[in-house]
Structures are given as C-alpha cells and as structure tokens.
C-alpha cells in the first residue's frame, strides 16, 4: 500500500485486522477523509480515493447503525474502491463491520494513536511520498547546519570541495545526483537517489570511496533541507563578480526560491573555507543581520560625517 521505511512504520503503529489481500491497494492522494457523512447516508460527494479515518465519533455512530440493523450505508460505502480504513485510539471495529468489508478488498487497520496524532503523522508521511520531485547533478552537504547544494560543470571540483568539508567535520547527504522534493509547498528536502550507494563519492584519480567507512556515521545524513545553492565556475576574467555581497542572487527549484552564490574557481582559492563562511553568513542573514548591507551603511554614514565637517571653501581659493 505505502512504501514506508522502518521509522515511518513505527511512528504510525498500524496493524491490519482484516482485508489483508487488499494491502496492495494504491493510494493516489495525500488527503484524509472522515466518513461521517457517508455513514449517515449522504453519497452525493464521496472522497473514496482518500484514506478513511474512523475516530471515536465515527465508531460510536457505526455501533448505533449496527445495533439498529441499518447496514445499507455501510454496504454502499464499500462499493467504492476505498484504499483502506483506519481506526484510531486502538478501537477494534465490530465483527459485523469486518464481515461487510471483507468482499470489498478494503484493508481495515487499527492504531493506538489518537485521531489528531494519526492525522498529523499520516499527512507528514503522505506529503513526503506525493511531493513533487526532481533530480539534480551536484553534491549536497550540511555545513554548520545549513544545507548547501554544490553545483557546477563536470570537473570543476564539486566532489573535492565536499570531501574537504567532510574532512573538516561537516556532513555529506548525497554526491553526484541529488533527489530534491518540495514538501509543504516551500521546503526543499534533498537526499540521495539510491540509499545503498548514496554516501559514496567519486574522486578523479582516486575512484569510488565510501564516506561512511572512512569517516564514520557522524559524517553523513540521510536527508537535509536545501537552503543555499553554490555554483562553482571557472574563473572568467571578463566577468564582473560581486565583491561587496550586496547583490542577492536567487535560483528556483520546483518553484521555490533559494539563495544562490556564484564562486569562481582558480588555483590558490580555498573553496571549502569560502563555503564555510557562506554558510555562517547565511545563518546570520536568517537571524536578521546582513554583513554587506551593514558595511555599506557604515561607509555611507562615514562619508556623510566627513562631508559635514569639510570646509565650504579652501583658504587658497581665488576669485
């Protein structure tokens, strides 16, 4: 039904009590539905493609229907291709309900979580699964808590820069091909495309190296939010590079704007240290302090003070 890793399965605490043969039912939408209106007999609009969540209220109404022998709404509900039904609070539905659900191949699941907890966790899991995704060439690293996507042409030194950052205590998320998903509409989460080979790096002249084995598990991360893109490029003497840092560049990934820094590469430049400084500077910006603008304002203020104390004429002026 859902491709969940061990951590996600544990967080949902789901167990199937009926309809095991329907566990392969596809889930095609990330929204949830509370089937109160359907149980009351309103079928003009049925959100049948959504996971059906039964809380205490729906369970109490369900018991009332079954005690009165009113099975029509329940039977009609199961004529739709429901992906699954989940009962929260550890509630076990009555046997009659399970019997009515059996022919429809609809899995009946139970969790100990409350309805609110289940909704929040399911929405988080489903948002990650159904998030729009793109694969980009580059290296994703975490530097001082900032997720930096290092991009650039082949051979410009992306992997070598990332390797030096790892040596300096920072962490690798993915090398060569980074899978980026847009979660909740404004958060870009990056990870390796293949978990089994995600923390390997290719270094020209050295070959493939295993970062986990060489530097330990503290040198890697499974995923990280992309908070900055650093574009490495060969030094172009005819190009005017920003030397003050007052020009803020941005790039767009999956319709989300991300700060962009263009760093020219040439012999003698210590790119890893520049990236460390860029990461700390980005953190300062997020805290409301912009070094370049502060410097620019200080210079303008100094010029105004000097202008105020300057004489209106020089003694040697002649008329």
From Swiss-Prot:
GO molecular function annotation: ATP binding; magnesium ion binding; phosphorelay sensor kinase activity; protein serine/threonine kinase activity; protein serine/threonine/tyrosine kinase activity
Residue numbers binding Mg(2+): 159, 202
Source superkingdom: Bacteria
SUPFAM superfamilies listed in its UniProt record: HprK N-terminal domain-like, PEP carboxykinase-like
Subunit note: Homohexamer.
Domain characteristics, as noted in the entry: The Walker A ATP-binding motif also binds Pi and PPi.
HAMAP family on file: HPr_kinase (MF_01249)
Name the UniProt record assigns to this protein: HPr kinase/phosphorylase
Organism ancestry: Bacteria, Pseudomonadati, Spirochaetota, Spirochaetia, Spirochaetales
